[in-house]
């Protein structure tokens, strides 16, 4: 069956994000790609990586397809069963939210499953829901699957953040140096917000790590409510806060019998990573796959010869799998 997708934009006035601690907008655009086929279709949520937005996912360039062009091509080739693709905006002024609720950033899980889901289901007839994402979005896909099994029935995790000691620890020194240079968390964030070139090496690594701390180890006693998992003077780990990071690491989540049972009940659990990932996420994917095998949890694990960036072509593999699995 050959068909095409339309692109619609909803305005979501989020009660979950109203009054969030960063002062970020609570009124957001929700981009939805809708198949021009009547009937009830599964909903596939596509979560961008750190610093990403729906605009990034949709953007075309001469050498890479945006998501709308990609799903139209897959549909025309007969590779994609009709599905509704939902692209939520979970960006924050620190660069992201990790798609979870945190008192330091805002209630982004609640935003997804209360505000955005309600808006989509009020407009279209939706079947089962699945989540796909890359990098931080891949992490968010797994986290939301185990925390919201009432909604999520299938997952595709592309180079998702996991095995945190490999993907995060190496970035702690850059944040510690930035805090020393600017005099603490609040002055650093003020300087970052004033910077004209925010994606430069001077800013990107430290603000990304600070954002992770805001998501994983919020602390109301700390500046901006962000608990640092290390001593900024010595880089010595603060075990209590670092353990809070590890508590949401997917390779640890699967050790919880409740989460293992949830993952085992999914219609699809697809995991991949490039063999040359700069954040070492292939190792986390291997560890997760090994633990899933040991627990007898059905999953698909693939590797491919590439690095971390510029791998959106892997959605050619996962989206057809998701759209088929969610119809079972």
List each model region and its residues:
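Non-catalytic cap/lid and distal C-terminal segments of serine-dependent acyl enzymes
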Residues: 1-328
């Amino acid at each position: 069956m050959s068909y095409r997708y339309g692109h619609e934009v909803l305005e979501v006035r989020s009660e979950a994000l109203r009054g969030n601690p960063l002062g970020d907008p609570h009124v957001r655009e929700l981009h939805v790609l809708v198949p021009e086929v009547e009937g009830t279709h599964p909903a596939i949520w596509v979560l961008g990586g750190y610093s990403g937005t729906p605009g990034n996912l949709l953007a075309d360039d001469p050498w890479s397809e945006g998501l709308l062009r990609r799903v139209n091509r897959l549909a025309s080739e007969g590779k994609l069963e009709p599905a509704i693709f939902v692209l939520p905006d979970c960006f924050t002024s620190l660069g992201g939210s990790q798609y979870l609720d945190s008192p330091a950033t805002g209630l982004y899980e609640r935003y997804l499953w209360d505000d955005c889901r309600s808006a989509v289901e009020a407009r279209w007839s939706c079947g089962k829901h699945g989540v796909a994402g890359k990098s931080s979005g891949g992490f968010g896909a797994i986290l939301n699957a185990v925390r919201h099994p009432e909604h999520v029935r299938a997952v595709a995790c592309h180079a998702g953040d996991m095995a945190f000691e490999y993907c995060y620890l190496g970035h702690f020194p850059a944040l510690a140096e930035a805090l020393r240079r600017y005099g603490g968390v609040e002055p650093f964030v003020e300087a970052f917000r004033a910077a004209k070139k925010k994606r430069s090496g001077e800013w990107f690594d430290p603000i990304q790590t600070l954002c992770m701390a805001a998501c994983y180890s919020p602390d109301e006693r700390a500046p901006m409510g962000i608990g640092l998992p290390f001593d900024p003077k010595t880089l010595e780990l603060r075990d209590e806060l670092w353990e809070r990071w590890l508590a949401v690491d997917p390779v640890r989540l699967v050790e919880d019998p409740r989460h293992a049972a949830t993952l085992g009940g999914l219609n699809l659990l697809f995991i991949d990573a490039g063999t040359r990932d700069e954040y070492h996420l292939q190792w986390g994917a291997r560890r997760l796959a090994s633990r899933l095998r040991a627990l007898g949890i059905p999953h698909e694990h693939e590797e491919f010869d590439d690095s971390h960036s510029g791998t959106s072509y892997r959605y050619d593999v996962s989206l057809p799998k998701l759209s088929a699995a969610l119809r079972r």
